[in-house]
Amino acid sequence: MKIQLLSDLHLEVQPDFLLRPAPDADLLVLAGDIGSYQYGSRLPGADFGLERFSPLRGWPVPVLYVPGNHEYDAVEFDATHARLRDTCERLGITWLERETVVMDKVRFVGTTLWSDFDALAQQARPAQQLKAREKAFRAANWYLRTTGTTRHGAPWLAEAVREQALVCQQWLREALAVPFDGTTVVVTHFAPSLHSADPRYGNVPGTAGFCNALDELLPLASLWLHGHLHCPSNYVHRGCRVVANPLGYAGKGEQQGFRERFCVAV
C-alpha cells in the first residue's frame, strides 16, 4: 500500500494552493491543520478546506483524516469536534480521531494526540520535572491565548490541553495493545518523539508543545505519520519509521521541504 501524506496545509492563509493526488497512491492521509477559521481566515466555505479532498467529489482514493490543533482556532472545542466529524461523514472522508480502521490488512490507529507538555520534563531530575512542565505551560499559553479556542466557556489553555492529551494517550495505548496480525500505522497530528523536533528551535520549553516523548510506543507500530511541526521528518527509531510531510507557511520559508506527491509504502 502506498500512502500519500499531507499535513499543515493552512488553507486559511493560502486558500488557492492547489494539491494534486499522487498518481501511484492507494490512500491519502491528512494529518491535521488542513484549514481553519481563525481570525483573518481566507478560507471559503464551511468545510475546513476538506471538500477538495472528498472522494465523493473526485478525489481518486480513500482519505483518512485526523484533525490538528488549528481547526479549533476561534471556536468552541466540543462543538467544532462534532462539526468536523459530521463534515467528514458528509464528504466521505474517514474520521480517525480516536478511531481504528483496517484497510487491506493494514491497521490505522489515529488521534490528534495533543501534548502533555512533559517531553522535556522527562529528561529532568525528579525535583525539576514539575518546573519543566510549568515552563512548557507558560511557553504554550503565550500562544494559546491568541487562538480564541474555548471549552466549557473558558479559554482553552495548556493545562486543559494536557488533560485532553492524557485522554488521547490512554486511548492510544489501549488501541495499540489490541493484538493485530498485520501492519500497524499510527496517525497523529502532534509528534510522538523529540526526534521530530524542529532543528530551527532545538529543545526549548516551547518544543514540549509540539512533541511528546512516547518513544516506548514506537515499537508497537511499523509506521507513525504526524504533522504539527513545520519541518519534514523521515527517520527510524526503535524499529518504527516516523514520517511527516508538512506544507507550512510560505512567508516563513517553510515549504522548501514539502513534497506534494510524496508517498510512503507499507
PLM segments and residue spans:
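Beta-strand-turn-beta hairpins that frame and shape the catalytic cleft
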Residues: M1-Q4, T100-G110, V236-R241
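N-terminal active-site segment of His-dependent metallophosphoesterases
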Residues: M1-Y65, Y72-A79, R151, A158
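Active-site neighborhood of phospho(di)ester-bond hydrolases with catalytic His/Asp-centered motifs
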Residues: L5-S7, L28-D33, V63-N69, T94-R98, ...
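Active-site environment of divalent metal-dependent phosphoester hydrolases
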Residues: H10-D16, S36-Y39, H70-T80, T100-M103, ...
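Short amphipathic alpha-helices and their capping/turn segments at secondary-structure boundaries
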Residues: F17-A22, F53-R57, W95-K105, R125-A132, ...
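Glycine/small-residue-rich loop that forms an oxyanion/phosphate-binding "nest" at active or ligand-binding sites
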Residues: V75-L96
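Binuclear metal-dependent phosphoesterase catalytic core
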Residues: V102, D198, V204-S222, L229-V266
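Active-site-proximal loop/helix segment associated with metal-binding centers of metalloenzymes
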Residues: V109-V185, P192-H195, R200-Y201
